[in-house]
Amino acid sequence: MSQGVEFNRLMLDMRAMQADAMSLPKVTAAPELAPGQSTFADMLGQAIGKVHETQQASTQLANAFEIGKSGVDLTDVMIASQKASVSMQAMTQVRNKLVQAYQDIMQMPV
């Protein structure tokens, strides 16, 4: 008799949970972006492009200095090199934070 009562109570609890779940609003898709708005992926891609441009400019300036092109100063080469280095380090840190955030989300219990 006790098992029958527990089973009935379990069924009532399940029906109550089902009714609660059915009353919740449905999940909707992500809202559409307005024209001119950028996604995170777009911004990240632009940042990577800027880092690449900085490195290319640094390399070109260093090559121009090495061949003795006039108007290219050693200080300009060193500043461009440091800018490229700092931008690469910053991009690496952003990548590390993104990977860590992804791992944290994947380890969350569902």
Curated annotation (Swiss-Prot):
Subcellular location: Bacterial flagellum basal body
Chief subcellular location: other
Keywords noted in UniProt: Bacterial flagellum
Record-level GO cellular component terms: bacterial-type flagellum basal body
GO biological process: bacterial-type flagellum-dependent cell motility
Database matches in InterPro entries: FliE
Keyword Zinc recorded: no
Molecular function as annotated in GO: cytoskeletal motor activity; structural molecule activity
PANTHER family listed in its UniProt record: FLAGELLAR HOOK-BASAL BODY COMPLEX PROTEIN FLIE, PTHR34653
Family listed: Belongs to the FliE family.
HAMAP family the record matches: FliE
Protein name: Flagellar hook-basal body complex protein FliE
Species of the source: Pseudomonas putida (strain ATCC 47054 / DSM 6125 / CFBP 8728 / NCIMB 11950 / KT2440)
